[in-house]
């Protein structure tokens, strides 16, 4: 008996169209790329009945390719069959990333006639991929572009596609290596999309250099993934460049399961589990995704919580499908051993909009994206952060009756303290000199509102309940519907962006006797704001706003030019580089020089990114050099030494004295002290 129910998403199969279908607002849509995924799963199963259905599904998907040669997107695909047009330009990548590897792996399971159709479709699709030529900032799509081009070229025996893909791969690696991590930082969804795409290339490419570059990018992404996983919540700590609402509010499977799947499928190495489980109980991680735009992400792990803050939102694409999805501030926390973790996160909202008021298109639900309407600048260090918002599109075009930053507790809270007083009733209004402490799960979250620009007669700060959430609202405006000439850019009245924001600090409940006790500690600190007097913008002048919090011997600060809403500087008491490629107690990365951590050192004389993971308690060290030029390579650890005369790109793993060396351009015999080589290439 052939049980189609064992195939993922089989319950969505519509035999009348041979595609997967979903109902949205009582209208049925047939999903093109998900149907392609369904076909792959059928082919992998391999029984005659499954293969027969797979052929029907593939043919149905191919009918959703744009075949009008006059169309500028000839060769692309519809996102849904019902659209009948190409709008989402990513559709071609999402279909090809399924059909190309499937055909390379399982050509013996696919009829000759269908293979011919697939190859014909792939050829015109790859021409469309080249015309679209996605930019290097779009991480998951550029990864699919590269994989589809190289493997599609192999499938078609067409070197021009391979050459284009290889060039783009090298350009992408160089782009990443100027910063630290890929531009789409720390996404609970698109991390895996990128890893899955690159894993096809690692497995199926005929070129060792291609394989090595793809593997280095994939593993570096895996390191970032692992460093942001919290061992107790089992979730991917913030900040997130893009997080759909079910992922943001922890309604999906834990990301620890996702990492395990990648490891179990041999896409990522097993030692990443050690990186998650065997590390300091309290740990700060900082990475940079864009040095030029000063985008860094900071995450602090404590026993019961993680705090994640981005220096700015992902704002490099003006696209309703992609933009305004960043999760720039969040605290994830445990709520006892058996409960789903809780979360508090932030949004800037206009006209009292909420979840359900925005959808990308009719065929996608209105509960996927909690639309972010603010621009954000922030800095984090340990359990503390300064978080600054400005409305993104408030000006003299659209009318508005409310504009506010909101801190949203998605899970039940236990207690609220204001200036040490336990609050029992909501709503309640506060002022910006109040100290607010919220007890939720196993943590306390303290908030100090910053000074706010009042665009009307009143700009209240209040704590309210909204749809089972508790929300701290920080208003810039509440009043009659109007435009704001003073915010129009360009404009004759513009004097800079509005001020709005908060200082946040998180603590373990077990460290304090009450919320009042924690509030007293936070109050001991000094919150300092300095801002320039109003001045009309002349195209060159600046108007600075600096915010700093000091307590004991610790300092955290950020300064912005409010005319451009750009970061001038960020600082802490002990960090000289606020835009490191990677800085943590167990992993670090640099563009040049020696890399040192935990009594271990990596020395590479050549130019190029190098990184080191050090887990001495697990007798595990991993080091890499990204190239692209040749370099010597010396890894010195407490248990021994690896010395390589020359390599172009390399990954060296030392686990319990067993050494694996994967490299291109390897010259000379590696010299080993204290260990044994078990694998070379």
Regions found by a protein language model. Give the residues of each.
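A broadly conserved detector of short glycine/acidic/proline-rich loop/turn motifs that flank catalytic sites
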Residues: 72, 306, 311-313, 392, ...
């Amino acid at each position: 008996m052939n049980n189609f129910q064992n195939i993922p998403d089989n319950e969505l199969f519509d035999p009348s169209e041979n595609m997967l279908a979903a109902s949205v607002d009582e209208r049925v849509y047939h999903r093109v790329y998900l149907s392609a995924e369904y076909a792959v799963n059928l082919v992998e199963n391999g029984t005659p009945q499954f293969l027969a259905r797979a052929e029907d599904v593939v043919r149905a998907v191919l009918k959703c390719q744009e075949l009008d040669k006059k169309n500028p997107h000839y060769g692309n695909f519809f996102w849904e069959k019902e659209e009948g047009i190409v709008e989402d330009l990513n559709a071609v990548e999402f279909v090809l990333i399924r059909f190309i590897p499937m055909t390379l792996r399982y050509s013996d399971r696919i009829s000759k006639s269908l293979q011919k159709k697939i190859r014909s479709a792939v050829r015109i699709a790859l021409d469309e991929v080249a015309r679209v030529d996605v930019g290097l900032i779009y991480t998951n799509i550029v990864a699919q572009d590269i994989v589809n081009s190289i493997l599609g070229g192999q499938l078609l025996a067409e070197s021009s596609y391979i050459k284009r893909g290889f060039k783009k791969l090298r350009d992408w690696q160089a782009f990443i290596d100027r910063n630290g991590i890929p531009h789409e930082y720390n996404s609970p969804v698109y991390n895996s999309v990128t890893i899955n795409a690159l894993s096809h290339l690692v497995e199926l490419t005929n070129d060792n250099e291609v394989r090595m570059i793809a593997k280095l990018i994939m593993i570096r992404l895996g390191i970032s993934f692992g460093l942001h996983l919290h061992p107790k919540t089992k979730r991917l700590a913030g900040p997130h460049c893009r997080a759909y609402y079910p992922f943001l509010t922890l309604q999906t499977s834990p990301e620890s399961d996702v990492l395990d799947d990648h490891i179990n499928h041999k896409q990522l190495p097993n030692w990443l589990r050690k990186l998650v489980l065997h590390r300091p109980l309290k740990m700060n991680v900082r990475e940079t995704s864009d040095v030029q735009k000063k985008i860094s992400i900071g995450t602090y792990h404590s026993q019961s919580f993680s705090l994640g803050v981005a220096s700015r939102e992902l704002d490099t694409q003006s696209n309703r499908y992609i933009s305004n999805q960043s999760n720039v501030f969040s605290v994830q926390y445990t709520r006892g051993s058996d409960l789903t973790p809780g979360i508090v996160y932030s949004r800037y909202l206009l006209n009292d909009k909420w979840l359900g008021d925005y959808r990308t298109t009719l065929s996608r639900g209105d509960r996927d994206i909690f639309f972010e309407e603010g621009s954000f600048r922030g800095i984090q260090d340990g359990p503390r952060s300064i978080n600054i918002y400005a409305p993104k599109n408030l000006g003299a075009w659209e009318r508005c009756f409310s504009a506010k930053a909101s801190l949203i507790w998605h899970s039940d809270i236990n207690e609220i303290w204001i200036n040490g007083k336990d609050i029992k009733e909501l709503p309640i209004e506060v002022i910006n000199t109040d100290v607010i402490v919220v007890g939720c799960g196993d943590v306390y979250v303290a908030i100090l509102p910053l000074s706010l620009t009042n665009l009307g007669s009143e700009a209240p700060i209040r704590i309210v309940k909204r749809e089972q959430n508790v929300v701290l609202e920080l208003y810039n405006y509440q009043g009659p519907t109007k435009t704001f000439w003073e915010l129009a850019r360009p404009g004759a009245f513009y004097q800079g962006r509005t001020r709005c924001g908060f200082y946040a600090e998180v603590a373990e409940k077990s460290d304090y006797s009450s919320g009042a006790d924690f509030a007293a500690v936070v109050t001991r600190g000094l919150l300092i704001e300095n801002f320039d007097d109003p001045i009309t913008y002349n195209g060159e002048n600046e108007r600075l706003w600096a915010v700093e919090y000091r307590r004991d011997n610790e300092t955290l600060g950020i300064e912005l030019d409010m005319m451009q809403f750009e970061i001038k500087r960020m600082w802490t008491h002990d960090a000289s580089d606020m835009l490191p490629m990677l800085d943590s107690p167990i992993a670090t990365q640099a563009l040049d020089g020696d890399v040192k951590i935990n009594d271990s050192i990596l020395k590479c004389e050549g130019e190029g990114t190098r990184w080191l993971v050090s887990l001495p308690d697990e007798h595990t060290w991993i080091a890499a050099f990204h190239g692209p030029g040749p370099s010597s390579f010396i890894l010195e650890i407490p248990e021994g030494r690896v010395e390589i005369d020359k390599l172009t790109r390399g990954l060296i793993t030392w686990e319990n004295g067993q050494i694996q060396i994967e490299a291109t351009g390897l010259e000379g015999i590696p010299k080993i002290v204290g260990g044994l080589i078990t694998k070379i290439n």
